Regions:
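Acidic, surface-exposed loops and disordered segments
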Residues: 1-249
Length: 249
């Protein structure tokens, strides 16, 4: 569809990790947060809390905890999105419901979905204002230290972190990486595994779209596995996620 501003923004959006010194204005911050609040939410519960990180020392601590990424500390706007199963539990208690069950795994999954939907609304709103963003998945690591740093109580779990700012000219010029084609990620009615040959074709097509014409599937996937899936930070993320999950089981 031509001349659709929302679709154009969604297609153009890419992660930005280098920002100009210009601040995110109070009006822009308010618009980004309001967009998050307007996101679809299960039962209109808004099962999340958003931390606006304004303390430079805390920004620096988060940058260190999140795989030592200094650009986090320098971002004009840093928001941590927490899956919050505590607010409604406290409301139940305040309403005199003494036998309210503790939140379970299903409640956490619903809250994480709510939280990530709100976060993506914030990303799209920022993009419409010319403000770039980057998701920081490493906020799931170092559960104990993260709980201490953010004063997280029981039944409150970090789902994602976002940094915002105006992209530099270099970041604006940087091409967005191509995605998989539809056939690689969409199944009709039921889940269907891609065959090894189909996987090779899917990955090669994406690589070609990104200008990698000499793509070697085995070499590339093995390197990615070593760098990401089998990495120390990935193992730490899994360990920390299990720490958070335990209180819901």
């Amino acid at each position: 569809m031509e001349n659709n501003a929302i679709l154009s923004a969604l297609s153009a959006r890419k992660s930005v990790r280098v920002f100009t010194p210009d601040p995110v204005t109070p009006d822009e911050r308010a618009a980004i947060l309001n967009a998050a609040f307007q996101a679809p939410t299960a039962g209109n519960q808004q099962l999340y809390t958003i931390l606006d990180i304004t303390d430079p020392a805390l920004k620096a601590a988060l940058a260190d905890l999140c795989d030592h990424q200094p650009f986090i500390a320098g971002a004009p706007l840093v928001l941590v999105f927490l899956a919050d199963c505590r607010r409604w539990l406290n409301a139940y208690h305040a309403a005199g419901i003494t036998d309210a069950r503790k939140p379970g795994a299903g409640d956490l999954m619903l809250a994480v979905a709510d939280t990530c939907i709100a976060a993506q609304n914030a990303v799209v709103a920022a993009e419409s204002l010319g403000i770039g963003s980057c998701y920081i998945g490493d906020v799931l690591e170092n559960a104990e230290a993260m709980r201490d740093a953010l004063h997280l109580p029981q039944y409150v779990v970090p789902a994602c972190m976002l940094v915002f700012g105006r992209p530099t000219e270099q970041q604006q010029r940087r091409p967005k990486p191509a995605r998989f084609a539809e056939k690689a990620v969409v199944c009709e009615n039921v889940y269907t595994d891609r065959t090894p040959d189909e996987l090779r074709a899917d990955f090669a097509a994406k690589a070609a779209a990104n200008g990698q014409l000499d793509y070697d599937f085995d070499k590339a996937v093995q390197a990615f596995c070593k760098r990401k899936y089998a990495s120390d930070f990935s193992r730490e993320m899994t360990r920390s996620a299990e720490v958070y999950w335990k209180e819901f089981l």
